[in-house]
Amino acid sequence: ALARGAVFNVPPNKVRLVAQPHGGSFGGKGGARGCDITILLSRKSGGRPVKWIEDRMEYLTGGAGQAWDRHYEASLALDKDGKVTGFRVKLLDDLGATAEGWGAVSSAKPLAAFTGCYAIPTAQYDLTIVATNKLPGSPYRGMGPPPHNFVLERLMDVAARKLELDPGEIRRRNFIPKDAFPYTIASGNEYDSGDYEAALDAVLEMGDYKALRERQKKAREQGRYLGIGLVNTIEPGVFDWNAYAVVGQPGTGVPEGATVSLDLYGKVTVRVGFALEGQGQYTVISQVLADYFGIEIDDVRVVHQDTLSAPPHFGPGGSR
């Protein structure tokens, strides 16, 4: 509703959007599309109701929801002890013809966890967003950070080889200490908590890391390759609106409101502002309220409302 209203210079309280259950998307279907605006313009000029019909093949060959087309140049600066002193990323991000939905925002979102789990004092992000005649890009299997995390973690592996350090050890030397939180990373976002060394230790123990390295050594003696991947990443669970200023997004929060009512028979109705997306959000809401009121989960009914009736909301997306 916000996006549609912004295009026509109409305040949000004058736009009524009725969402429908739309299958799994993890937020990828939450943005505005060009066809939405076309429909509204057609309705305004023609004066008659307009229906947009699009099948799966049409969407797959002309709609958003495509994976990234990113071109990276990146480097790490380290001292002789394996401590990272700087991280630089130059990214050319091809968002296709229209960058529907959250395309440009996904380019900025890596700033929310730019230096990952590591205490890297300085960082640089040179971001160029381009439009081409390709299909529109949008959030897909993670809203921006996954390719960035891949680049950072590969650089950590390269550095480990050059310094003849174990991949786990170089990461351990660079983790943000657990007693340093809350911690502000170089891009300006604040982490509230974390114990990355304990998480690494748990993974190494569960995977019997030493035994894996022995197996790898024996395999190479026999002319076989056994790969072992070690990765430590952070996936931002909400949004860093400071980063979104890069692409002109407003610095608002991400509220999620709900209206709860209890009838004479002890049944609960909760009204939310988002439709089903296929990840079981309504089940979670029902379980939380059933536990809180001490009732059966079947005694809770979840209803989604239109944008004018619902409390302040954002809806599922961005790993939240």
Spans of model-derived segments:
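Structural alpha/beta core scaffold segments of enzyme domains
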Residues: 1-320
